[in-house]
Amino acid sequence: MAHIGLMPQQAKHSKDYKVKGRSLEEQELIISDLNAVEKSGAFSVVIEAVTEKLANKLTKLSKIKTIGIGASKKCDGQILVTEDLLGFFSKNAKFVKKYADISSYISKAVKKFKSDVISRKFPSKKNIY
C-alpha cells in the first residue's frame, strides 16, 4: 500500500500540513507519484489531504484501489487515524470527524490515577506481587 498527497511523516513544520494539489505543478507531481507507485507494484494507495477535484481525477486514473483521508468520497475507500476518530485530541484536521470523545475519559482517568498515587491508594495490596 502506497501513500501520496500530504505525507505527515515527512512534514518538518506545521506549515507543511496543508492541502496538496491546489497548483497545477502539485497536481502533476501527485499524478506522477501515483504512476510511480502503480509501477512499483502497490496494490492500493492512500490519497491524503488533496483537493477533491484531484482525488476524483486520481481515482479515475488509478489502476489500483484508492483510499481517501481528507480527499474525496469518490475514492474507493476511506480511512481515519484511530486516535482522531475516537477523539483523543481536542484539535484535529478539517477532514477528521470525531465519532467519540475519548479525551475526556483519558483526562479523568489520568487525574484519578494521579490522585490515587499521591494519596497512596495505588498500588494497593491487590496490585502488588
State each model region's role.
Residues 1-129:
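Alpha/beta enzyme core
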